[in-house]
Amino acid sequence: MLTGKTIVLGVTGGIAAYKSANLASMLIKLHADVHVIMTQNATKFITPMTFETLTNNKCIVDTFDRNFSFDVKHVSLAKRGDLFIVAPCTANVIGKLAHGICDDMLTTTMLATRAPKLIAPAMNTGMWENPILQDNLTKLKGYGYHIIDPIIGRLACGDTGTGKMNSEEVIVEHILSFMAKEHDLAGKHYLISAGPTQEAIDPVRYITNHSSGKMGYAIAKMARLRGAKVTLVSGPVNIKPFCGVDLVPVKSAADMFQAVTSRSAEADVVIMCSAVADYTPAVYADQKVKKHDGDLQIELKRTQDILGWLGEHKPANQTLVGFSMETENLIENSRAKLLKKHADLICANSIAGGNTGFAVDTNKVTLISSQEVKELPLCSKEETADLILSHIQTLA
C-alpha cells in the first residue's frame, strides 16, 4: 500500500522507543522507504543499528555527523519525505515543536518539511494532563499536526493511566489514511451497515446468522482510506473498525433500523451490507425458557425492511446500495430486489462456492444496476470493496 512512499520516523527518548522498531518493520512490510531520525536521548533506549538493520537506511542522530554523503540532511529529508511520524513523542519534543525550537536533527527537519506531520505522544499521566502540554498540543493542531492520542495503560512509573503510546497497528492505520490511497471520496459521507443482528428469544438465547461483518468493515476501511467521512452501523462482530470510522454498535434488527434511518438523510451514499434478520420472536421471554419433554414453538414476526424504507425515503442525489446473498437464481432475484427496493445498485453474492460469502477473506460479487450487470473477479474483500466503491462513483 505504501510502495514508492518515503516515511520519516522520528524516535524520541521514552521507554516506548522500543516499539518504534516494530513500527518501522510494519511500514517496511507495506513497502515504504523508511528513514529514521533519533534524538540523542532515544539512543539510550534503543540503538541506531536496530533501525539501520530494519530499514536499510542510515539512522541519523547527530546534525553535524560527517559520516555520510554530502547534502544538507535536514533539508534533504524534509523534501523527500512524503509523511513524518514521531513515535514516541515526548513532552519535551512536543514543547520544542510547538515553539519552533530547532536544537537537533529531528526538530530541525520537522520545521523544514511541508509534508503531513503526525505525532504519537507517550508520557506520564500527570505530564499528559498538564495544561502546558495540552496548550502545546493545541498549538501543534493549529499548525497542521495530527495527534494520535495515547491510551490508558500501565506506564513506566508503575501507574495505570492515560499516557501509553497508542499501538503500532493504530499508528499504521493513521499513516495509511493519509497516504495509501488517492482521496477521491473526500467531502463525501458514507453510511455503511455491517454484520449480523441478534434477535433475542430470552435473556440467554437469540436468533442470528453466519455474517462475520468482514465485507462491510472492508468497505468502511477502503472508503475511509479514500478520504470519505464514514459512519459504520454494525451488528455484533469481532472486528475493530479502521481508524477514523465512526462506529455505531447495534444488536437487533430494530436497533439497526433506528440507527440507519436516523442517519440516512445526511449521507451521500448508503451501503446496506449487513445481514439483517428477516424475522424476530413475536414475544420476548423475560426469564430463561426452560426445556421440557415436548417441542418448543416460537412465533416469529417480520422485522422492518430497512433497505425498502431507505428506497422510499431516498433524498435526491443520494446513492443507495444493497447486498443480496442467494443460493440460486442470483441475477434474477437480485434484479428483482433492485427494482422492489428502489436501490441504485445491488451487490449480489452467491454462497455456492467455498471461497465466497460468510466468514472467508475473499469474495466474488456481481454488480447489478438498471444499466448493466458487471461480474467482479474473485479477490480479497478489501479489493472487492475498492472495486465496489469505484463503481459507485460511476453512478453518481
Name these PLM-found stretches.
Residues 1-118, 124-213, 217-396:
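A cross-family phosphate/adenosyl-ligand binding-site feature
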